[in-house]
From Swiss-Prot:
Subunit structure: Part of the ribosomal stalk of the 50S ribosomal subunit. Interacts with L10 and the large rRNA to form the base of the stalk. L10 forms an elongated spine to which L12 dimers bind in a sequential fashion forming a multimeric L10(L12)X complex.
Transmembrane segments annotated in the record for this chain: none
Name this protein carries in UniProt: Large ribosomal subunit protein uL11
An example Gene Ontology molecular-function term: large ribosomal subunit rRNA binding
CDD domains: Ribosomal_L11
The organism of origin for this protein: Nocardia farcinica (strain IFM 10152)
Gene Ontology cellular-component annotations: cytosolic large ribosomal subunit
Pfam families, per database record: Ribosomal_L11, Ribosomal_L11_N
Length: 144
């Protein structure tokens, strides 16, 4: 007989600094309410993201009814990648009036390649348009 499939109790989505998960909020309370072993998750997440230190890495945690879990790492948010490429701390408070930085289309394509697996796009050109739209909404000008 095939093994029984575990029943899903919930999905938790978090954005945590790579290699820096700890039981403090927001990680502890989010996992605690589902009865997950918090330290076990922190150790597994930190080991999986050690090579990406300095980035915020979104994670989707599937919690099962027997309190076990598994997680899937996503790519860093497009906004964070754009800020890093533009060399600024934060986007514009008035994006369509005040532009805070400029990025080239090559930089946008590079970010699109990184984000491709998480974007709802069929090819790099469509993904680049999505990233360019994010840049515009942050007050970052995209130069052709």
């Amino acid at each position: 007989m095939p093994p029984k499939k575990k029943k899903l109790a919930g999905i938790i989505k978090l954005q945590i600094q790579a290699g820096q998960a700890n039981p403090a909020p927001p990680v502890g309370p989010a996992l605690g309410q589902h009865g997950v072993n918090i330290m076990e998750f922190c150790k597994a997440y930190n080991a999986a993201t050690e090579s990406q230190r300095g980035n915020v890495i979104p994670v989707e945690i599937s919690v099962y009814e027997d309190r076990t879990f598994d997680f899937k790492l996503k790519t860093p948010p497009a906004a964070k990648l754009l800020l890093k490429a533009a060399g600024v701390q934060k986007g514009s408070a008035e994006p369509h009036r005040n532009k805070v930085a400029k990025v080239t289309m090559d930089q946008v394509r590079e970010i699109a390649k990184t984000k491709m697996e998480d974007l709802n796009a069929n090819d790099i050109d469509q993904a680049a348009k999505i990233i360019a739209g994010t840049a515009r909404s942050m007050g970052i000008t995209v130069e052709a």
